[in-house]
Amino acid sequence: MPEHPRHCDFQRGNVEIGLGPGGDLLGKRLSCPCITSHCSSEKKARSKDPQATSLLPELESTMAPEDHYHQLMSALSEASSFEETQRLYHLGIPSHDLLRVRQEVATATLRGPSGLEVHLPSSTADHRRKQGLVQRREGAVPAAATSFSEREMSQPPPLLSPQNAAHITMSSHLRPPFLGMPTAVCQTPGFSFLPSAQAEMLARQQELLRKQSLARLEMSELLRQKELGSVHRPLLPAPEVALHIPEGPDELQRRGSMLVLKHSSAPLLALPPQGPPGPGPPIPPKESARSRSEKGSLGVQPSQPKETTGAGLWAQEVSEEPSKDSDGEDPETAAAREGTSTPSQVPAGGTRAEGRGLLSGSTLPPPLPLGFPCGAVSPYFHTGTMGGLFTDEETTTLEDVNKWTVDDVCNFVGGLSGCGEYARVFGEQGIDGETLPLLTEEHLLNTMGLKLGPALKIRAQVAKRLGRVFYMASFPVALPLQPPSLQAPELSPGHQPLSPATTTSPYEGTHLPTGQASPKQENGSGTIALLSGAPDPSQLLQ
């Protein structure tokens, strides 16, 4: 045993473990209460003792490698005060060298006990060199560390924290002053402080991930909207189709004719060349026209309304009509069918087309507002055999309602079923033939106090006697057919009027100016041609 057994007890209280000169940094020695101020003299005496050098072989032979490793780990893991650690870093000790030395200690511990050296405590590095310790790591010890005692030097924080440990990024004004190194860690297990460079890199990665997720969400939303649009698109009309506004009179006329055809009235199409399918054999176009002219000249008319009725029911579509009607017809008739004739050509050169019940393209009526149906299925219109635009013997004969007196109007209303009680109201209001066509549903219901059924019946009967399909379209002023001052047109030889009543009808006039309307009574059937001229306000509702 050595002379000073009190100082040779290999306990944690007075044992210093180190690796060569690095013991200044790696050695851990806690103060013992029994050590007094004469410790330095005892250390000097003990260092000069030749038996002190024999301690190393004994220690190495008596201590197992596991004991060396446990003592080393316990010395490294002992925490020190914050002030001592802060002073250690303020000395300017490089953190990289410090970590390198600690890693070498761990490597030497794993290799074997020969790498560990246990020596007695001494006050200076010169005494440790005299004890024969290994000097190969002398350059790694900073020069500034030799001026302080081992008591003032404390163990730095443990090794680097694992990669999966929680990191705390703090700003510079919240960090401890010694955490400026790129690899500095916190002493608290499980947490560590990220340096500024690593914190910025982590923030950039998080921002990039956030932007990628947002872009992915936006793309998925766009794809979903596109799929929904493709699913619901066939159910909705295109905006340009739904909000299309007709441009020009030609477009208005085309839309008007298509509207009439769509609602099953077809008043604008003539008899097809091959004739309608029926009980009788079909008649060729030229022969049928010639036979009709002969029948009109002889006054034989009973069978013709049936043919015109068939023309209204078996009218062709607009797309098929020009191609089928162009065969076997002269250019004049074809031009009249295609609507290329002008208003000046209608009275003179368009007699054949008008005789067949066709209106030229320039004389098509404008479309009804809001697509109001004016077909044969509508109960508000007197369609007759040709949709109300054409008159024949099956329809009510046109009467001069304008010449009716108040008594005539009262008799007319009293003669209708369910309207007899309202004849007195018409007499009190002074309704005569001129004002009767001007009455609207609002006048009849609100002003005169009629019920809805009688009011509609009166308007339907007035429209039937006027022969105007637009009378029941809720217009306060019906579309005028011709001014009252006009004389009956001159009839061509071989043509006769429908009945004696039509000779005294309001269709009086010699020659029509352009833009007015005139009835064409030809081949035993009356045809009303509507021209595109604006009516005179003084010539309304005849």
Swiss-Prot record:
Positions bearing Phosphothreonine: T342
GO biological process: negative regulation of transcription by RNA polymerase II; retinal rod cell development
GO MF entry, a single one: PH domain binding
Presence of the UniProt keyword Ligase in the record: no
Disruption phenotype annotation: Double Samd7 and Samd11 knockout mice show shortened and disorganized photoreceptor outer segments, reduced light sensitivity and delayed signal transmission from rods to rod bipolar cells at low flash luminescence. Show an up-regulation and down-regulation of cone and rod genes, respectively in the retina.
Keyword Phosphoprotein: yes
Domain of life: Eukaryota
SMART domains xrefs: SAM
One GO cellular component term: nucleus
Gene3D superfamilies per UniProt: Transcription Factor, Ets-1
Sites bearing Phosphoserine, chain numbering: S499
Biased composition (Pro residues): 273-285
Keyword set, alphabetical order: Nucleus, Phosphoprotein, Repressor, Transcription, Transcription regulation
Residue ranges of every copy of the SAM domain listed in the record: 404-469
Polar residues bias (residue ranges): 499-526
Tissue spec. comment: Expressed in the outer nuclear layer of rod photoreceptors in the retina (at protein level). Predominantly expressed in retinal photoreceptors and pineal gland.
Cited function: Component of a Polycomb group (PcG) multiprotein PRC1-like complex, essential for establishing rod photoreceptor cell identity and function by silencing nonrod gene expression in developing rod photoreceptor cells.
UniProt name for this protein: Sterile alpha motif domain-containing protein 11
Organism listed in the record: Mus musculus (Mouse)
Classification of source organism: Eukaryota, Metazoa, Chordata, Craniata, Vertebrata
